[in-house]
Structures are given as C-alpha cells and as structure tokens.
Amino acid sequence: ALERGLPFLGVCRGHQELNISRGGTLYQKVHEVPNMMDHREKDSTAPNEIQYGPHHDVKLVPNTWFEKSLGVSEFWVNSLHGQGIKTLGKGLAPLAHAPDGLVEAMYCTDVNQFTLSMQWHPEWLTHENPLWIKIFEMYGDACRDFRAAHRSHRV
C-alpha cells in the first residue's frame, strides 16, 4: 500500500506490522516489562460492551494533524494486545501514547499519502464513539481522494 501510494489504516496487528516492516521492534509480552501496563484482554467471556469497552486513556501528541483532526487531546480506548511497539521503525512518528508510554497510534512521516495506525480497535463499538467514526471518515476521504486522482490519469 505504501509503495503504491495507497491510503493506509492499520489496526492492532496492522499497527505492529507497519512498525516491523520499517525496521521497528516489539515487546513480545508488554505485561512482563517493568513499569508497563497489562494491555491484554481482561475477560474473554465478558459481554462485548465490557470486553471491547474502554480500558485505558491515550494522550495525543500535541499539535499533530491527528490531534487537530479529532479536536481532543486524550480519550479512552479498548485494549486487547499482548505485544506492543518497543522501538519505532524508520519514518514513523507517534501520534498517541498509553499512560505507560507505549505508542498507541503513529503515522509515516516519509510518504505523501494518508497513513494512520493504532493499537486499539476502532471498529468495535463504533456506534458509541464519534472519534472512531471520525477516524474512518478520514480514511474514507483519503481513499476517495486517491481514487479520484487516479481516475483523472486514465486514458
């Protein structure tokens, strides 16, 4: 997607894979790292509203396009992962952090297209969270812009 100039939205494992693809590293078991939170799912038998509900807050990096687009500086996210970003890959910059400092959202600084990845799952309980809807709207707008730009180049 990045090589072709396509808009990119990475969620959970996609967030981690973007980092790995650019030379970054992961904590394999975040919960075993001193001073890090347990980001894993708490109770897989709980109803969806609890299982995929808010787990911890994230603070957005000030004055980034992400903070400006969402119009907030922090919000709560679900958390269902055992791995997490240890070191950022080449050309990646953080957009949000968990209270323990773990990178929860990032983007590519060295490409021209829309790129956004996040550790949480905005596709769950989207109807209850206008910020999740805004994220998908931004991605949808980028996809439509890409399509329109490439249609105009057809013969």
Task: State what each model feature region is.
Residues 26-30:
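Short hydrophobic/aromatic-enriched beta-strand-loop microsegments
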Residues 1-25, 121:
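Catalytic nucleophile loop
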Residues 1-6, 31-155:
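Amide-donor transfer/coupling interface in amidating biosynthetic enzymes
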